[in-house]
């Protein structure tokens, strides 16, 4: 079970948002590359980057910070990026620049043809980020709730050839209220591709609960606010996951 620290980028800084609101940003570091090195030193085996400006603008906006992170740790652990990835040229630039995976969110829902083409052109590199509330998919930085059922969409994307699904329960993200394990398991059971849990990881109870259902196809979880504000010790969490998964 991978605990994957998130580095959320806004205006070149590492921040955390509350429930996806740009005006609710807390700055944790002025140097995202140093932050990346910190997580690597703590035993991270993968990093999750989000270009927040990019997510809202529809194209990547934190290129310098992303490049600095990849220069710092890209040769040592896989790095994945989401936020504003809406065309094949952007994906190509990301992969050529050293990213292992790109995460497609809103564009997957709005433009499934693009997702299909991306999976064909870059097999093994495409992750879909599905954000849902009460089982329904949300788009556009969580601002719009669609009528799409999350399991139905995920199955379709699996057929396209996506590498994995990151499932975020947006009612919980950044609120430190615990992961929605039940909904994540329900999704993982319906798929054969891996699922990464996200949204609301708070403490060791979440790690224990996740490891108990690892066999359903849940391979990791994104760690955000909890590992930044100190309520969850990252290294201890990964050590626990390794022990329980052994």
UniProtKB/Swiss-Prot annotation:
Its EC number is 5.3.1.16. It is an enzyme of class 5 (isomerase). Pfam families: His_biosynth (PF00977). Keywords: Amino-acid biosynthesis, Cytoplasm, Histidine biosynthesis, Isomerase. Pathway: Amino-acid biosynthesis; L-histidine biosynthesis; L-histidine from 5-phospho-alpha-D-ribose 1-diphosphate: step 4/9. Its main location: cytoplasm. It catalyses: 1-(5-phospho-beta-D-ribosyl)-5-[(5-phospho-beta-D-ribosylamino)methylideneamino]imidazole-4-carboxamide = 5-[(5-phospho-1-deoxy-D-ribulos-1-ylimino)methylamino]-1-(5-phospho-beta-D-ribosyl)imidazole-4-carboxamide. One of its GO terms (cellular component) is cytoplasm. The active site is at residues 8, 131. InterPro entries: Aldolase_TIM, His_biosynth, HisA_bact_arch, Isoase_HisA-like, Isoase_HisA-like_bact, RibuloseP-bd_barrel. GO terms for biological process: L-histidine biosynthetic process; L-tryptophan biosynthetic process. Transmembrane segments: none annotated. It is found in: Cytoplasm. Belongs to the HisA/HisF family. NCBIfam families: 1-(5-phosphoribosyl)-5-[(5-phosphoribosylamino)methylideneamino]imidazole-4-carboxamide isomerase. This is 1-(5-phosphoribosyl)-5-[(5-phosphoribosylamino)methylideneamino] imidazole-4-carboxamide isomerase. It comes from Dechloromonas aromatica (strain RCB). The lineage of its organism: Bacteria, Pseudomonadati, Pseudomonadota, Betaproteobacteria, Rhodocyclales.
């Amino acid at each position: 079970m991978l605990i994957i620290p998130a580095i959320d980028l806004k205006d070149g800084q590492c921040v955390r948002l509350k429930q996806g609101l740009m005006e609710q940003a807390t700055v944790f570091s002025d140097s995202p590359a140093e932050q990346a090195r910190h997580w690597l030193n703590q035993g991270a085996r993968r990093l999750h980057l989000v270009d927040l400006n990019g997510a809202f603008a529809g194209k990547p906006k934190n290129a310098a910070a992303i490049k600095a992170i990849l220069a710092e740790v890209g040769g040592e652990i896989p790095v994945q990026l989401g936020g504003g990835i809406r065309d094949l040229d952007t994906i190509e630039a990301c992969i050529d620049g050293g990213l292992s995976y790109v995460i497609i969110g809103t564009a997957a829902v709005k433009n499934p043809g693009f997702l299909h083409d991306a999976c064909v052109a870059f097999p093994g590199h495409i992750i879909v980020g599905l954000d849902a509330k009460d089982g329904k998919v949300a788009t556009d930085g969580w601002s719009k709730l669609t009528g799409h059922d999350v399991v139905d969409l995920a199955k379709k994307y699996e057929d396209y050839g996506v590498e994995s699904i990151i499932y975020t329960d947006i009612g919980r993200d950044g609120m430190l209220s615990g992961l929605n394990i039940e909904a994540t398991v329900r999704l993982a059971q319906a798929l054969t591709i891996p699922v990464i849990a996200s949204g609301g990881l708070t403490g060791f109870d979440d790690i224990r609960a996740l490891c108990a259902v690892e066999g359903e196809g849940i391979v990791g979880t994104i760690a955000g606010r909890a590992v930044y504000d100190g309520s969850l010790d990252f290294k201890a969490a990964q050590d626990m996951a390794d022990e329980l998964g052994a």
